[in-house]
């Protein structure tokens, strides 16, 4: 599940945790929140790679 995640900094990891916690606070399950944030990270990384 996480093999294709790009490398992210500690700060980015902390931000991801905060986004996951926000989603969970709104009622999203833990697994779904992690999936949503992981998909966002992948999309952001892909966009950066295309822009390079």
Curated annotation (Swiss-Prot):
Disulphide-bridged cysteine pairs: none
Stretches assigned to coiled coil: none
Signal peptide feature range: none
Protein family (similarity comment): Belongs to the UPF0181 family.
NCBIfam families: PRK05114.1
HAMAP family for this protein: UPF0181
Protein name per its UniProtKB record: UPF0181 protein VPA0916
């Amino acid at each position: 599940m996480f093999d294709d995640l790009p490398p992210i900094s500690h700060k980015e990891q902390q931000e991801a945790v905060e986004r996951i916690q926000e989603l969970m606070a709104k009622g999203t399950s833990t697994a779904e929140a992690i999936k949503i944030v992981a998909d966002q990270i992948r999309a952001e990384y892909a966009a950066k790679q295309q822009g390079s």
